[in-house]
C-alpha cells in the first residue's frame, strides 16, 4: 500500500530567498498540494524573518497543506515580544537573544527597526509597535510536533524512552545530547532540525534536516515516501541513506 509523500523543510532562520528555493523544489516534485512540515526556527540570524513568517501565514490562509512547528528561536522571539526579556534560563551559555550568537537583531531589522545598538528596553518599545500582533500569535500557537504514520516531525528531538504523550514541549524545542547520542530505535523515525550539520543526515532512528541556514548554508527540503527518504535539489530527488552505525 502506497502512502502520499510528506515533505519537510529544515531550519529557515530568516533566509527568505532560500525558503522560496526550497518551496520551488517541493512544488516541482509534489505540486502545489504537497503536504509540507516546517521544522521550526523560522527567525533569527537571517535578514528575512518577517518575510518568512508572512509567507507561511499566507500559505496556510490559501489552504496549503502546511504544518509549521515551533523552534527554540521562535519561542525566544515570542518571549522578547511578551516581556522584553533577552535572557532565558534555557540558553545554557547565558548569551542574550539580541546578541550575535542567537541573532535576534536581524529579526528586529526585518520589521524596519533601526538603532540596533540601543538598550534592549528601547528595542522592545519599538518592536511592540512594529511587529504585527498576528505574527506573535502565529508563533505562540505553533505546535511542538506532528505525527504522520511512522514519522514524528519535531524541531529538536525527543527524550528517548518516553511515550509521546509524556514528551515535554521544551525538550522538543531544545534537546540535543540525550537525543542525538542515543542510537536505539524510537517508535517512529524522528525528523528534526535544531542541531546544525554540514548536510542532512539519516542516522537510522532519526533524520536531521538542519543543514545550517543560520550560518548561510542552504536550507534542506526532503521528501518521505513509502519508507524512503530523499533530499531535494534543482535536479530532483537524491536518496538519503542511513549512515552505518559504526560511524555514529
Feature annotation, model-predicted:
Residues 13-17, 44-47, 73-78, 160-161, ...:
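Active-site environment of divalent metal-dependent phosphoester hydrolases
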Residues 46-141:
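Active-site neighborhood of divalent metal-dependent phosphoester bond hydrolases
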Residues 1-55:
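N-terminal active-site segment of His-dependent metallophosphoesterases
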Residues 21-24, 51-54, 82-85, 167-168, ...:
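Short, glycine/charged-enriched secondary-structure capping and boundary segments
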Residues 102, 106-208, 212-218, 224-240:
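Acidic, His/Gly-enriched loop-helix segments that form or flank divalent-metal centers
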Residues 37, 230, 240, 244-248:
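Intrinsically disordered, low-complexity terminal extensions
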Residues 3, 31-34, 63-65, 149, ...:
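A general structural motif
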Residues 8, 36-38, 68-69, 152, ...:
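Residue-level marker for buried hydrophobic side chains located in beta-strands
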